[in-house]
């Protein structure tokens, strides 16, 4: 066993060990030194690095290590590696040398080498001095201040006996020639000097032994041992060990370079706060280096002591350098991206990195939380470097947040001032996730939007949260809103945000319902535009039919509309509702649209696009009511013409003939062709009227009435303006699908309107509700095709009714039915009636087919839809088609 240990020591030193070296080696192997937490190098790795590159020596070392391990001679796995350090501390001079030069020189070693060690007394004195050296090593290296235990006499005697036997075998090779000693002294680096140089390097300053070199490829500087020491006296293992300590200087220099580069450019508040936090971290680093420097001045510090402290310092400064490099090197990073990067480090599994990342995040996020607090309180933006952006004509990054998983259509973007003032950006450069959870982001955004809405749209400039609430917001620790905390809904700051959100929502709903009278305006739309006050449209039809046709102008039409309102039950509505009724004339001045003028803030709920839908519904009912009026006029003309012709026949028969004529003989006097025409006209007129009444009844009782009843019930229970907007929009959408109206009322323009001339391209104008195009597909191509075919057929039927009314009026304009001209006109009217029946049957079949196809169309924008309404209307139309005049065409 003893020979194996000596062989291992020779392989390490590449020479015969001296007596002192052997004794220290044996003492270490037989002692219970505590494991010093200096580094992660183990014994085997250290020994093998010393003989790296020599296959023969490597095999011999492996065999020695194997034998030692099998015999359990090594009590400590790392003991062998620390032999060199023990030898170094014995003389207070640290020799960094290659294996063939490795030696420790003591101040008295030269004298000891020249004097023969032969007497027993000298050996005992030498043993005592080594024992004292051993205690010194314990206290300095391992900080073992309580090491009062002495080596047992048995162990000491055994070691000395072993050393005596070995000394007897030694030859003159133990002694070091004076010539070799002089050469070694030249290449020796004192430990005090190397520690001083390493402290300089840790501050980024090159010294006597370490120099700062910049990598030509990456441009990154790092500390290395100067070349002359690498080639003469320092092994690669020892140089690498020291360069690890000196790398603190590289990390410090890297942080300093990044901070200097950033301060020379324009930077946002987040980047500035991060730089301030990094400066604080570097100041603490410099203070710790100063303490090391003062400790080195007061008492000599060993390299091992410096290593124990430097490893901890290196962890912290390297973490600062990594975070600074990731956040500051790329100048294109936005503030949210920087915060998300730091947030990732704050969630790191390593405690040190987690602590540093969290402290930097708290400091760097201060401007962001100030921005959030100002947005919540004032409803205005301090800057645009974060996720909330003003909506402009160039906004293409509007993020739609789903507010309720059960109501899919809540995520539908609606052209409303509530949505079009501000938006959450969907740009990857501005996203707050994972810094903030989507729930917290939505709450904060909606609170500020409510504040802005109350101040600007509601013209309530003085509106403000109570001072107690404002004080709570300003004093709240918004760092608790970070997604690592806010997952707990009961957390104090999250509960505060939820309470403020509820307060702002109730304030908006109250001012919409009470001050701006939402329900009154919805009733006005219901009774006037949607025709639920059944006598308004007939009254308007009567007034317009009594006046001559021609071009229609806004002022004259307004007078007629006001006259119609005053002559029906609509006049009972409040004056502020009647004052909103308006008229819109198309460019041809032949058609008009009764409309309803909505002002802010109600335009956020009843949007211009939805008003357009109401105008369309009024136009459909106007066509049907006009057609119904024409059908009533046809029966009046028929009855009037019949009475006039009967009177003419009786007059021609004379006073006496009146008593001779009876019904049968009277009908025989009337031409058969005229009788057949009147009979067919009456039949098709009745069936057409049945169709018109079925459509009017369907619109009023199946489409409008149930949806508005549901709407009013939902609005009463609504707690947020988003709920009000949603419920009204769902009512409009449902009516559109029930009435087969395929107008994408969110698309108010093919393209955003150009900016005003006075505004520059760099400052896009603020949008209103009609300026944004919503790319959402409300109706599929199949749906649009079906709905368009249905209304095209409806328009054609109404147009044919008007032509039929004209044909009947021309025929019944004749004074006598016994003239040749009347006979010719009767034939023309009969031919037109045949064409009308064919057209009526065709369009009726088209409408029935459309209703049948509607039962299979998908409706993705509504949570639920009852397709039975289509079946009910189809049954009504089929009843019209079963008449004898239309049955054959229907079968075809």
From Swiss-Prot:
Record keywords: Cell membrane included? Answer: no
Keywords for this entry? Cell projection, Cilium, Cytoplasm, Cytoskeleton, Flagellum, Microtubule
Where does the record place it? Cytoplasm, Cytoskeleton, Flagellum axoneme; Cytoplasm, Cytoskeleton, Flagellum basal body; Cytoplasm, Cytoskeleton
Q: Which Pfam families match?
A: GCP_C_terminal (PF04130), GCP_N_terminal (PF17681)
Q: Its GO biological process terms? A: cytoplasmic microtubule organization; meiotic cell cycle; microtubule nucleation; mitotic cell cycle; mitotic cytokinetic process; motile cilium assembly; spindle assembly
Observed effect of gene inactivation: Knockdown of expression by morpholino results in increased number of cells arrested in cytokinesis, reduced volume of median bodies, increase in disorganized cells impertinent for cytokinesis, and reduced length of the caudal flagella. However, knockdown does not have an effect on the number of cells defective in cytokinesis or abscission.
Q: Which InterPro entries did the record assign?
A: GCP (IPR007259), GCP_C (IPR040457), GCP_C_sf (IPR042241), GCP_N (IPR041470)
| Entry GO terms, CC | 9+2 motile cilium; axoneme; ciliary basal body; gamma-tubulin complex; gamma-tubulin small complex; median body; microtubule; spindle pole
| One term of GO molecular function | gamma-tubulin binding
Function as written in the Swiss-Prot or TrEMBL entry: Component of the gamma-tubulin small complex (gamma-TuSC) involved in microtubule (MT) nucleation for the formation of median bodies and in the biogenesis of flagella. Gamma-TuSC may be required for the correct positioning of EB1 within the trophozoites.
Q: Subunit details for this protein?
A: Component of the gamma-tubulin small complex (gamma-TuSC) composed of tubulin gamma chain, gamma-tubulin complex protein 2 (GCP2) and gamma-tubulin complex protein 3 (GCP3). Interacts with tubulin gamma chain.
What family is this? Answer: Belongs to the TUBGCP family.
Q: Protein name, please?
A: Gamma-tubulin small complex component GCP3
Q: Which organism is it from?
A: Giardia intestinalis (strain ATCC 50803 / WB clone C6)
């Amino acid at each position: 066993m003893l020979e194996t240990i000596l062989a291992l020591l020779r392989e390490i030193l590449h020479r015969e060990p001296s007596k002192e070296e052997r004794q220290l080696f044996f003492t270490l192997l037989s002692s219970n030194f505590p494991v010093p937490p200096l580094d992660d190098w183990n014994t085997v790795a250290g020994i093998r690095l010393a003989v790296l590159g020599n296959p023969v020596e490597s095999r011999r070392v492996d065999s020695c290590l194997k034998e030692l391990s099998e015999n359990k001679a090594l009590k400590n796995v790392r003991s062998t590696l620390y032999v060199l350090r023990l030898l170094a501390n014995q003389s207070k001079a640290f020799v960094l040398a290659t294996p063939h030069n490795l030696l420790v020189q003591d101040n008295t070693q030269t004298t000891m080498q020249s004097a023969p060690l032969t007497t027993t007394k000298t050996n005992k004195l030498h043993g005592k001095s080594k024992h004292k050296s051993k205690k010194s090593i314990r206290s300095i290296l391992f900080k073992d201040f309580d090491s009062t235990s002495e080596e047992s006499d048995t162990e000491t005697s055994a070691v000395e006996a072993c050393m005596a036997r070995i000394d007897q075998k030694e030859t003159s090779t133990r002694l070091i020639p004076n010539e070799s000693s002089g050469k070694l002294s030249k290449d020796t680096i004192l430990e005090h000097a190397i520690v001083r140089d390493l402290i300089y390097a840790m501050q980024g300053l090159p010294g006597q032994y370490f120099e700062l070199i910049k990598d030509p490829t990456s441009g990154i500087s790092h500390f290395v041992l100067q070349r002359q020491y690498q080639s003469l006296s320092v092994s690669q293992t020892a140089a690498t060990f020291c360069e690890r300590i000196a790398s603190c200087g590289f990390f410090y220099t890297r942080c300093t370079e990044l901070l200097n580069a950033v301060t020379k450019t324009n930077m946002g508040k987040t980047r500035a706060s991060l730089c301030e936090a990094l400066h604080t971290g570097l100041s603490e680093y410099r203070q710790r280096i100063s303490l090391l420097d003062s400790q080195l001045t007061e008492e000599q510090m060993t390299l091992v002591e410096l290593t124990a402290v430097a490893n901890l310092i290196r962890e912290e400064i390297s973490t600062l350098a990594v975070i600074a490099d990731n956040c500051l090197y790329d100048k294109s990073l936005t503030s949210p991206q920087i915060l998300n990067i730091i947030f990732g480090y704050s969630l790191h599994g390593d405690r040190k990195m987690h602590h540093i990342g969290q402290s930097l995040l708290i400091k760097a996020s201060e401007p962001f939380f100030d921005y959030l607090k100002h947005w919540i309180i004032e409803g205005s933006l301090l800057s645009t470097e974060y996720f909330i952006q003003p909506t402009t004509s160039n906004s293409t990054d509007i993020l739609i947040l789903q507010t309720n998983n059960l109501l899919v259509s809540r995520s539908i973007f609606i052209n409303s001032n509530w949505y079009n003032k501000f938006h959450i950006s969907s740009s990857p450069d501005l996203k707050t996730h994972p810094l903030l959870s989507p729930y917290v982001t939505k709450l904060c955004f909606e609170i500020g939007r409510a504040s802005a809405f109350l101040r600007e749209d509601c013209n309530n400039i003085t509106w403000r949260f109570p001072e107690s609430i404002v004080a709570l917001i300003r004093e709240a620790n918004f760092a608790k809103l970070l997604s690592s905390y806010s997952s707990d809904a009961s957390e104090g700051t999250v509960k505060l945000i939820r309470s403020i959100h509820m307060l702002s929502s109730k304030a908006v709903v109250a001012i919409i319902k009470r001050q701006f009278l939402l329900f009154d305006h919805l009733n006005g739309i219901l009774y006037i535009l949607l025709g639920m006050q059944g006598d308004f449209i007939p009254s308007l039809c009567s007034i317009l039919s009594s006046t001559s046709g021609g071009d229609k102008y806004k002022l004259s039409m307004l007078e007629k509309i006001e006259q119609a309102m005053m002559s029906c039950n609509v006049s009972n509505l409040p004056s502020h509702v009647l004052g909103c009724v308006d008229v819109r004339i198309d460019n041809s001045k032949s058609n008009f649209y009764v409309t309803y003028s909505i002002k802010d803030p109600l335009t956020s709920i009843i949007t211009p696009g939805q008003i357009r839908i109401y105008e369309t519904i009024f136009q459909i009912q106007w066509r049907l009511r006009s057609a119904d009026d024409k059908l009533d006029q046809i029966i009046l003309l028929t009855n009037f013409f019949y009475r006039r012709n009967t009177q003419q026949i009786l007059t021609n028969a004379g006073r006496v003939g009146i008593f001779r004529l009876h019904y049968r003989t009277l009908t025989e006097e009337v031409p058969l062709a005229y009788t057949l025409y009147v009979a067919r006209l009456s039949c098709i007129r009745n069936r057409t009227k049945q169709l018109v009444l079925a459509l009017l009844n369907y619109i009023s009782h199946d489409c409008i009435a149930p949806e508005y009843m549901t709407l009013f019930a939902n609005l009463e229970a609504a707690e947020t303006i988003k709920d009000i907007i949603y419920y009204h929009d769902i009512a409009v959408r449902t009516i559109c699908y029930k009435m087969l109206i395929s107008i994408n009322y969110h698309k108010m323009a093919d393209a955003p309107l150009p900016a005003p001339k006075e505004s520059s391209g760099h400052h896009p104008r603020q949008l209103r509700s009609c300026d944004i195009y919503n790319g959402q597909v409300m109706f599929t191509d199949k749906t649009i095709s079906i709905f368009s075919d249905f209304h095209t057929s409806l328009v054609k039927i109404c147009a044919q009714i008007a032509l039929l009314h004209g044909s009947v009026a021309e025929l019944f304009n004749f004074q006598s039915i016994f003239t040749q001209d009347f006979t010719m006109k009767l034939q023309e009217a009969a031919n037109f009636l045949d064409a009308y029946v064919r057209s009526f049957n065709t369009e009726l079949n088209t409408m029935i087919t459309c209703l049948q196809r509607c039962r299979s169309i998908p409706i993705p924008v509504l949570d639920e839809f009852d397709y039975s309404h289509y079946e009910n209307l189809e049954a009504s139309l089929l009843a019209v088609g079963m008449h004898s005049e239309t049955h054959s065409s229907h079968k075809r």
